[in-house]
Amino acid sequence: MIIRAPTRTMTKSFNGRQMGFKFPSVENMPQNPLDEYHMNNHHLLNDNIAKSQQAQAHPHPPPHQKPISTDEDALSNINSDYTSGSNTNTNSGNSSNGYYSFANISDNTTPLPNKMYSYPSSPKSNESSEGGKMSELTVPKDEHNQSSQKSTEPMEVIPEDNGFTSMSLNVQSIPTADNFSFDIASSNSLRPGSTTDKPGVATLARTPSSNTSRSSLLSPSVRNPSSSSARIRQSKRRSQLKRSPSIRCKGGLLKYFHLLGSRIKKTLRKIKLALRGKNSKRQASYRRSTSSTAAPKVARKPQVNVTRASSKKELTSHLKRTNGYVSNLKRSMSQRSLRPLLETPEKCATAGSLHTPHPDTSSSDAFVTPPGSRIVRNPTTSLRRTPSSIRRAASVIRTPIPAVPSATVAPSESFVYEDATTASPGSANGSENRSGLVRSTASKSLNSLVRQRSIVVKNKVIPLSMHQYSIKEEDEDKEHDSQFMIRPSSDYSLSPVHSVSSEGNGSNYDSDFEKYYSTGDYTDAYEDAEMGSFISSKRTSSTNTSSTAASSDAVSYTESVVPSVEPTVEPAVESKSIDDGEDIDETTDSVSFNNEIEELRSNINHYFRCVIARRIKLRLQFSHYESSNSLSPSYLDIMESLLKDYDDESTAGKDPAEFNTIDEEDEVAASELWSPRDSKTGSIRVNVQTPYLKRGPTQHSLISLNSRDVRRSLTLPIGMKV
């Protein structure tokens, strides 16, 4: 078994462990502020250089002083490399030797007041084999050059502390960024008398090629006042220096002044054009007046209607063209199709015929713009269709206007809305301007129809919302008895008209009365009735709870409910009947209209008596059952009767033909469905089914599904658990 010991067991950094030495940071800074000498680590390097010089100067130390070993040699810590002889690391060929080497550090953390830095040039240090041969490197010091550099050169490296802090006590230091390595010299500092060469000092050599490149890149451009062209050329030349990124940002001053200058240029250009146009108009009027007074008898040539070159230009911008707006096309067909809608009803009555276009509109010069006239575009939208406009037209569906009796409608107004009761085949635009499409009208947009909540069960979409959308389609032949007409009676079984007609009150209605209600939105009427019943039940339950809680008779309670509900509906209907009764000559239409209003009033009263009173009774009995907290047979009978009443209420909204002919099989199925008692356990088993499920396409909704058939999909709402 071979155990490999690591070669590098301890890292030595300046005669101590690596964990003992910490670079200065916010965590280990003392509370009192430190100067620049204690904030950097270059004095450690300088002290070690002095220590190595002292060790070389005294090879035999005194007996009381500890001798310096080869491992703790400070100079080998600094100037060591992988191949040095003093390195005892056996793995020195391909790894670190365990010592820090500060030979490559070059930053501007050690500034000095003067610009002269030198390595020790003693003969002992030059003769030493480990330190190598070191020569002094000097940068000439000239006060005039320093001031000129600070004033003209923006790229000169600026020390961090501007030379006002303390420095190391040792004279020796390493060259940093403040001296020769990153010093950028300008053309003013490169004069031949500026450098003072000292004897015995190797100066930094500067080649003439670097001088020319530096002076050409960094020297500021000197203007020649003699030639104006050179001045203009130099002023337009961009400077080679980099700007600060803070000026180039969006909110900087450069952006602000650039925008300001462009705005001023635009306004000046507009003012110049306006003044030029005024002067040209004035000169043209002056020439016209002088020519008319000078030669009034000269026969003028007949003006030929020739379009200018400016009128032949395209007047449509590319932004409008992307939206489908083209202004320079000859649209004779679209203008001809839109003309009957643009003309007023008075023009329609005076014309007395269909709007046939004039023969000159189809000619080629009908849409040519005259040279002196202004171009007035048609404000109406064109018939050009883009996919976005088709989508917009499909999503916005007009709400139907309720039908008015045909005697009050003028024949000139029937071309906008062709209703089932008003439009006749002989009326204006009734049979000619037919689009050939089945027009659908609804009370809600297609977005709400498509975006309703739904789940997918066995690859079939099942809606979760109970909304009934009143989509009524009209055939293009306007046939009322067509097989494609969707009757609202099959969809809206809880409407006030048909729910009352099932009871036998006013079962035969006029055809006009059915037409009057065929265009209505029963969803809104049903919601209003629900709100009214809820408010009335709140009012009556607050006043009559003490009197009705003990009694189980619901008839007396329904008699007390009706007077509070009836005044909410009757005044508007009575005002209509009074206004109709004040007419002096009552025709047969007004009599039938009054009869319809009376029937409507009785139907609404019957609806409130039957449906809403039954719901109030249901709520009271539920509250009575919850307060008892017992499962005696009497309360089980109450629950069974409640569920049967609720079942009767759900079946009360069928068609009159279906209501009277209920099969016995349906009754047996209903009794099996609604029986609350379980024969095996004797407990209550309630299968709640709302009256919404008995009608419409949502019969097989989420409540009537088995749990094994329902699977989660992406269309399921987030907050719902199945």
From Swiss-Prot:
Segments of skewed composition (Basic residues): 275-285
**Composition-biased stretches (Low complexity):** 79-94, 117-132, 206-229, 286-295, 558-575
Listed transmembrane segments: none
> Which segments of the protein form a coiled coil according to its record?
none
Give start-end positions of Polar residues composition bias: 187-197, 378-389, 490-510
An example GO CC term for this entry is: cellular bud neck
Where in or outside the cell it occurs: the entry states: Bud neck
Lineage top rank: taxon: Eukaryota
From the UniProt entry, list the residue stretches annotated as the region Disordered: 52-94, 110-161, 187-245, 275-325, 349-389, 488-511, 558-588
Chief location of this protein within or outside the cell = other
Stated family: Belongs to the AIM44 family.
Protein name, please?
Altered inheritance of mitochondria protein 44
Question: Organism source for this protein?
Answer: Zygosaccharomyces rouxii (strain ATCC 2623 / CBS 732 / NBRC 1130 / NCYC 568 / NRRL Y-229)
Taxonomic lineage is: Eukaryota, Fungi, Dikarya, Ascomycota, Saccharomycotina
Quote the gene name from the UniProt entry.
AIM44
